[in-house]
Amino acid sequence: MAVEKTMDKIVALCKNRGFIFPGSEIYGGLANSWDYGPLGVEFKNNVKRAWWKKFVQESKYNVGLDSAILMNREVWVASGHVGGFSDPLMDCKECKARFRADKLVEDHMTANGAEVATADGWSNEELMDYITKNNIVCPKCGKLNYTDIRKFNLMFKTFQGITEDSKNEVYLRPETAQGIFVNFKSVQRTTRKKVPFGIAQIGKSFRNEITPGNFTFRTREFEQMELEFFCKPGTDLEWFNFWKDSCWNFLLNLGMKEENIRMRDHGEEELSFYSNATSDIEYLFPFGWGELWGIADRTDYDLNKHAEHSGQDMTYLDPTTNEKYVPYVIEPSLGADRVALAFLVEAYDEEELEGANGKVDVRTVMHLHPALAPFKAAILPLSKKLSEKADEVYAELSKHFNVDYDETGSIGKRYRRQDEIGTPFCITVDFDTLEDGCVTVRDRDNMEQQRVKIEDVRAIIEKSLEF
């Protein structure tokens, strides 16, 4: 019987097992703020490491970067964020609740069975016309009496220095991409990379979202994993398809089922004016389909904008053909928090097993890919009298992996605890271990056990981490 996955179950497990806690909880919390606990930080770091491994370490084309969160204000003027990075807002005149007009429209589309529910690029007039014609009432009070739609800039503004004037105005970056674009020439010069090549970055971004929600899916502070891939104009669609396939396979190789993800290509009416193509990889969350990964062919728009505003030359001289051109950019942009949440949802399972006296025993298990699991193994001495030997096993394995140690409670309860946090292997040290140098290795997914020489355990774990 298929388990019903709900966000309530996922959130409860995350809170109870130390994956994710509400932010500032002892002070009543802060709306839509989340802290990654001991297991959560290991898990999310593993997600980031997996992305870096595939998109940087294993790619001869790509290099890394870590740019500053605070940047010169003119960067955001050039990119268009100061003038145009905004959401369409409207208030209910009756109950004073505030909503994003485009989200009201998209929610209505979804509720009425639309295959593609998007209002991207719609004007204020188009949004209001749709809301009025379809009688989309206020979700809070049920009245149809809204203010006019107005734009609200999403960037967090602050000041650098001791005086709060326009000369000291800075923003918390709303995306990591612009830090890559402004460093394009420096990276190309110092690495001697030839086009095509890419620059990858993982980092925090901030958006003053009006309607955040669904746990860590949409938050005001979030982490991005972005690649800006620079290629010769005319080869961009070929590279666009290459990176689409790479992103898709990354998710499948780490355990996502194909029926739970889909590739949605943007229609012409959705495309930005500068884009040749854009596709989103979406995941089927308990609350519906949600975007994980956006892959966009941004042409030469970004580099040209920065060249225009900075006065710096952003052209590339091809050493083979002596051609000069501004490279086109393919951008696969992935939310670290979103994809981490998707992996948690995908892994969650409840299995009905026969317990004592024929009663049904429900086993909660997280089928995380071992590469993503917070702990790769747990060392479980059968008795506290075996602690010395168990410590030796722990000391050896912890040099290579993040492993847990647990000697409290029955062995069955310890197995269940590790199942619930996704630990792939439980390694039991028993009294026979002292005689034969073997341990019992239990597999999380099928619960099968095998006796293994202590010196062979490392190889078993290493093999499981491949993807």
UniProtKB/Swiss-Prot annotation:
Q: Which GO terms describe its cellular component?
A: cytoplasm
Record localization:
Cytoplasm
Record's PROSITE patterns? Answer: AA_TRNA_LIGASE_II (PS50862)
Q: Which GO terms describe its molecular function?
A: ATP binding; catalytic activity, acting on a protein; glycine-tRNA ligase activity; protein dimerization activity; transferase activity
UniProt keywords (A-Z) are:
Aminoacyl-tRNA synthetase, ATP-binding, Cytoplasm, Ligase, Nucleotide-binding, Protein biosynthesis
Question: For substrate, which residues are the binding ones?
Answer: 100, 175, 222-226, 331-335
Residues in coiled coil: none
In terms of CDD domains, this protein maps to: GlyRS-like_core, GlyRS_anticodon
Annotated positions binding ATP? 207-209, 217-222, 291-292, 335-338
One of the GO BP terms on file: glycyl-tRNA aminoacylation
EC assignment: 6.1.1.14
Give the reactions, separated by semicolons, that this protein catalyses.
tRNA(Gly) + glycine + ATP = glycyl-tRNA(Gly) + AMP + diphosphate
Assembly and binders: Homodimer.
Per the record, the similarity remark reads: Belongs to the class-II aminoacyl-tRNA synthetase family.
* Its biological purpose: Catalyzes the attachment of glycine to tRNA(Gly).
Matching HAMAP family, A to Z?
A: Gly_tRNA_synth_B
For this entry, the protein name equals Glycine--tRNA ligase
